[in-house]
């Protein structure tokens, strides 16, 4: 939804995507999304992808160094770049941390969805044609069997009282595989379920080779 908001706003020109990848697992850290799935997602969206590699777990200092290196690489390709957009919704401490880090690096943070009501935002996501699955669930906040499910109105109706519909407190993480901005949907196969750190239930999703 943050990408939608930026692409619909003529004051912004989106030139690429940036995310962190764990070197030893070859995945997006908390989401558990495989690198090849992430690359297929970026290709389907028609946007270049910058992959910032980290060991996991990584300290804030290590994260900041890797993030700074990625921004330096992005600006080397596009010298006029000054802004990085985030999908954060209401966590003020996280926003302040991002803004402080970027200011130190001579960049500016943008939050297109800031203070959007999360209950309506979650439902608008699906109504607009976006499709996603839950790839990780924090089992201290949600039942493990939410992992792997479609992010749809039925799931939203089943969330327990106190759970944020957009997972802003880390209740869950998702993988978007189709939507209005996708040139074509990602075809995925469900893989195994794994509990990590005695807390995080991951559902693996692999690219389905077809034929299509």
Question: Which stretches of residues belong to each language-model region?
Answer:
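Nucleotide-activated chemistry modules centered on ATP-dependent adenylation/adenylyltransferase
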Residues: 1-212
């Amino acid at each position: 939804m943050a990408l939608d908001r930026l692409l619909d706003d003529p004051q912004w020109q989106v030139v690429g995507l940036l995310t962190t990848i764990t070197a030893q697992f070859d995945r997006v850290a908390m989401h558990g999304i495989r690198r090849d799935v992430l690359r297929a997602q970026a290709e389907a969206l028609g946007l270049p992808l910058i992959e910032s590699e980290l060991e996991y777990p990584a300290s804030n200092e290590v994260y900041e160094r890797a993030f700074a290196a990625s921004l330096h690489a992005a600006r080397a390709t596009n010298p006029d770049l000054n802004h990085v957009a985030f999908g954060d919704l209401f966590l003020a401490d996280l926003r302040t941390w991002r803004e402080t880090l970027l200011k130190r690096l001579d960049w500016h943070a943008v939050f297109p969805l800031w203070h959007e009501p999360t209950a309506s935002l979650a439902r608008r996501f699906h109504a607009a044609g976006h499709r996603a699955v839950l790839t990780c669930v924090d089992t201290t906040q949600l039942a493990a069997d939410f992992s792997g499910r479609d992010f749809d109105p039925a799931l939203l109706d089943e969330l327990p009282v106190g759970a944020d519909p957009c997972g802003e407190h880390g209740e869950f993480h998702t993988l978007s595989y189709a939507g209005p901005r996708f040139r074509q949907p990602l075809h995925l196969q469900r893989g195994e379920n794994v509990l990590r750190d005695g807390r995080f239930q991951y559902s693996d999703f692999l690219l389905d080779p077809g034929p299509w």
